[in-house]
Amino acid sequence: MRLNKMTGRVIATMGIAAMMMTQTAGVMAAEQTENKQLKVVYYNQADYPGKKIGGSTIQAAGCGPTAVAVCYSSLTGKKADVPKMCKQAYKHGWYYTGQGCSHSVVPGLSKLYGMQCKGLGMDKDAVEKALRAGHPVVALMGPGDFTKNGHFVVLTRMVGKDKVKIADVGSRARTAETWSLKKVIRQGKEGANAGGPFWEISVKAGRTRL
Protein backbone atom coordinates (compact mmCIF):
# COMPACT_ATOMS: atom_id res chain seq x y z
CA MET A 1 0.00 0.00 0.00
CA ARG A 2 1.32 3.45 -0.94
CA LEU A 3 1.27 6.38 1.48
CA ASN A 4 0.67 9.89 0.23
CA LYS A 5 3.07 12.69 1.18
CA MET A 6 0.77 14.13 3.86
CA THR A 7 0.37 10.76 5.58
CA GLY A 8 4.12 10.25 5.46
CA ARG A 9 4.75 13.63 7.06
CA VAL A 10 2.23 12.90 9.82
CA ILE A 11 3.84 9.56 10.59
CA ALA A 12 7.31 11.14 10.59
CA THR A 13 6.13 13.90 12.92
CA MET A 14 4.57 11.38 15.28
CA GLY A 15 7.80 9.40 15.27
CA ILE A 16 9.88 12.46 16.16
CA ALA A 17 7.44 13.42 18.92
CA ALA A 18 7.58 9.92 20.38
CA MET A 19 11.37 9.99 20.32
CA MET A 20 11.44 13.37 22.08
CA MET A 21 9.02 12.13 24.76
CA THR A 22 11.23 9.09 25.34
CA GLN A 23 14.34 11.25 25.65
CA THR A 24 12.55 13.65 28.02
CA ALA A 25 11.38 10.77 30.19
CA GLY A 26 14.93 9.48 30.28
CA VAL A 27 16.28 12.84 31.41
CA MET A 28 13.60 13.13 34.11
CA ALA A 29 14.41 9.64 35.37
CA ALA A 30 18.11 10.49 35.49
CA GLU A 31 17.40 13.69 37.42
CA GLN A 32 15.29 11.78 39.93
CA THR A 33 18.06 9.22 40.34
CA GLU A 34 20.65 11.93 40.89
CA ASN A 35 18.52 13.90 43.36
CA LYS A 36 17.27 11.39 45.91
CA GLN A 37 15.80 13.12 48.95
CA LEU A 38 16.42 11.90 52.45
CA LYS A 39 13.43 11.65 54.80
CA VAL A 40 15.00 13.65 57.59
CA VAL A 41 14.37 12.90 61.25
CA TYR A 42 15.44 15.89 63.33
CA TYR A 43 16.84 15.95 66.86
CA ASN A 44 17.82 19.04 68.86
CA GLN A 45 20.31 19.17 71.71
CA ALA A 46 17.99 21.34 73.79
CA ASP A 47 15.38 18.56 73.90
CA TYR A 48 17.39 16.75 76.61
CA PRO A 49 17.56 19.21 79.53
CA GLY A 50 19.83 18.06 82.31
CA LYS A 51 21.07 15.01 80.41
CA LYS A 52 24.83 14.61 80.65
CA ILE A 53 27.71 13.87 78.32
CA GLY A 54 30.82 13.48 80.42
CA GLY A 55 31.08 16.49 82.71
CA SER A 56 28.86 18.65 80.53
CA THR A 57 25.31 18.53 79.15
CA ILE A 58 23.95 17.36 75.81
CA GLN A 59 22.62 20.86 75.19
CA ALA A 60 26.07 22.40 75.65
CA ALA A 61 28.36 19.75 74.20
CA GLY A 62 26.37 16.95 72.57
CA CYS A 63 26.22 18.20 68.99
CA GLY A 64 28.39 15.38 67.61
CA PRO A 65 26.34 12.42 68.84
CA THR A 66 23.09 14.28 68.12
CA ALA A 67 24.18 14.86 64.51
CA VAL A 68 24.98 11.17 64.12
CA ALA A 69 21.54 10.39 65.61
CA VAL A 70 19.91 12.48 62.86
CA CYS A 71 21.73 10.39 60.25
CA TYR A 72 20.86 7.11 61.94
CA SER A 73 17.12 7.74 62.19
CA SER A 74 16.90 9.38 58.76
CA LEU A 75 18.62 6.45 57.04
CA THR A 76 17.10 3.54 58.97
CA GLY A 77 13.72 4.82 60.19
CA LYS A 78 14.62 3.73 63.72
CA LYS A 79 14.37 6.04 66.70
CA ALA A 80 17.71 7.11 68.12
CA ASP A 81 18.39 7.26 71.84
CA VAL A 82 20.43 10.47 71.88
CA PRO A 83 21.42 10.33 75.59
CA LYS A 84 22.61 6.75 75.08
CA MET A 85 24.63 7.79 72.03
CA CYS A 86 26.25 10.50 74.12
CA LYS A 87 27.12 7.94 76.81
CA GLN A 88 28.65 5.72 74.12
CA ALA A 89 30.73 8.65 72.86
CA TYR A 90 32.07 9.23 76.37
CA LYS A 91 32.61 5.52 77.01
CA HIS A 92 34.69 5.08 73.84
CA GLY A 93 36.83 8.14 74.48
CA TRP A 94 35.31 10.40 71.83
CA TYR A 95 34.44 13.08 74.34
CA TYR A 96 36.92 15.18 76.31
CA THR A 97 35.66 16.97 79.39
CA GLY A 98 35.83 20.71 78.93
CA GLN A 99 36.70 20.37 75.23
CA GLY A 100 33.78 18.57 73.63
CA CYS A 101 33.67 15.65 71.20
CA SER A 102 36.67 14.62 69.15
CA HIS A 103 36.39 14.52 65.38
CA SER A 104 36.52 10.72 65.61
CA VAL A 105 33.04 10.68 67.15
CA VAL A 106 31.50 10.76 63.66
CA PRO A 107 33.19 7.67 62.15
CA GLY A 108 33.26 6.00 65.56
CA LEU A 109 29.56 6.26 66.39
CA SER A 110 28.57 5.62 62.78
CA LYS A 111 30.39 2.28 62.78
CA LEU A 112 29.05 1.43 66.24
CA TYR A 113 25.49 1.87 64.97
CA GLY A 114 25.98 -0.10 61.76
CA MET A 115 26.48 2.79 59.36
CA GLN A 116 29.20 3.48 56.86
CA CYS A 117 31.21 6.68 57.13
CA LYS A 118 33.43 8.18 54.45
CA GLY A 119 35.62 11.20 55.12
CA LEU A 120 35.27 13.80 52.37
CA GLY A 121 37.68 16.41 53.65
CA MET A 122 36.79 19.77 52.07
CA ASP A 123 35.81 18.28 48.69
CA LYS A 124 32.75 20.26 47.58
CA ASP A 125 32.03 18.00 44.60
CA ALA A 126 32.12 14.90 46.81
CA VAL A 127 29.74 16.54 49.30
CA GLU A 128 27.29 17.44 46.54
CA LYS A 129 27.48 13.95 45.04
CA ALA A 130 26.73 12.38 48.42
CA LEU A 131 23.72 14.62 49.00
CA ARG A 132 22.29 13.96 45.55
CA ALA A 133 22.60 10.24 46.28
CA GLY A 134 20.42 10.72 49.36
CA HIS A 135 23.27 10.38 51.86
CA PRO A 136 23.46 12.85 54.76
CA VAL A 137 26.78 14.58 55.32
CA VAL A 138 27.91 15.42 58.84
CA ALA A 139 29.81 18.70 58.88
CA LEU A 140 32.11 20.09 61.54
CA MET A 141 31.71 23.83 61.23
CA GLY A 142 34.29 26.41 62.22
CA PRO A 143 33.79 30.08 63.18
CA GLY A 144 31.07 31.75 61.12
CA ASP A 145 27.31 31.48 60.83
CA PHE A 146 26.98 28.33 62.92
CA THR A 147 29.46 28.68 65.75
CA LYS A 148 32.25 30.71 67.30
CA ASN A 149 34.46 27.68 67.71
CA GLY A 150 33.26 24.25 66.52
CA HIS A 151 29.85 22.68 65.95
CA PHE A 152 28.55 19.52 64.25
CA VAL A 153 25.57 19.83 61.89
CA VAL A 154 24.09 17.60 59.16
CA LEU A 155 23.78 18.56 55.49
CA THR A 156 20.62 16.79 54.37
CA ARG A 157 19.93 17.60 50.70
CA MET A 158 20.69 19.83 47.74
CA VAL A 159 18.23 22.55 46.76
CA GLY A 160 18.54 23.45 43.11
CA LYS A 161 22.02 23.77 41.69
CA ASP A 162 24.07 25.17 44.56
CA LYS A 163 21.99 25.46 47.73
CA VAL A 164 21.74 23.04 50.62
CA LYS A 165 19.45 22.27 53.56
CA ILE A 166 21.01 21.68 56.94
CA ALA A 167 19.77 19.99 60.10
CA ASP A 168 21.44 22.12 62.76
CA VAL A 169 21.03 20.15 65.97
CA GLY A 170 21.59 23.34 67.96
CA SER A 171 19.21 25.67 66.13
CA ARG A 172 15.76 25.18 64.66
CA ALA A 173 16.00 28.65 63.11
CA ARG A 174 19.13 27.80 61.11
CA THR A 175 17.58 24.45 60.20
CA ALA A 176 14.69 26.29 58.55
CA GLU A 177 17.04 28.28 56.31
CA THR A 178 18.57 27.34 52.95
CA TRP A 179 22.34 27.77 52.62
CA SER A 180 24.91 28.26 49.89
CA LEU A 181 26.96 25.06 49.63
CA LYS A 182 30.08 27.07 48.78
CA LYS A 183 29.63 29.13 51.93
CA VAL A 184 29.15 26.03 54.06
CA ILE A 185 32.29 24.41 52.64
CA ARG A 186 34.30 27.58 53.32
CA GLN A 187 33.17 27.54 56.94
CA GLY A 188 34.18 23.92 57.49
CA LYS A 189 36.53 23.53 60.44
CA GLU A 190 40.15 23.97 59.36
CA GLY A 191 42.57 21.32 60.53
CA ALA A 192 39.87 18.71 61.09
CA ASN A 193 41.07 15.12 61.37
CA ALA A 194 39.47 11.67 61.06
CA GLY A 195 38.59 12.46 57.44
CA GLY A 196 36.68 15.66 58.25
CA PRO A 197 35.39 18.25 58.37
CA PHE A 198 32.78 16.59 56.11
CA TRP A 199 31.71 12.95 56.36
CA GLU A 200 29.29 11.06 54.12
CA ILE A 201 27.05 8.69 56.08
CA SER A 202 25.24 5.75 54.49
CA VAL A 203 23.93 2.26 55.15
CA LYS A 204 24.10 -0.86 53.03
CA ALA A 205 21.71 -1.13 50.08
CA GLY A 206 18.21 -2.14 51.06
CA ARG A 207 18.35 -0.62 54.52
CA THR A 208 17.69 3.03 53.70
CA ARG A 209 14.38 4.90 53.98
CA LEU A 210 14.64 6.58 50.54
Q: What positions do the PLM features span?
A:
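Solvent-exposed loop/turn segments at secondary-structure junctions
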Residues: Y48, V70, G77, K91-Y96, ...
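Sec/Tat-exported extracytoplasmic proteins
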Residues: A67, C71-T76, A89, G93, ...
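Active-site-adjacent substructure of cysteine-protease-like catalytic cores
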Residues: Q116-V169
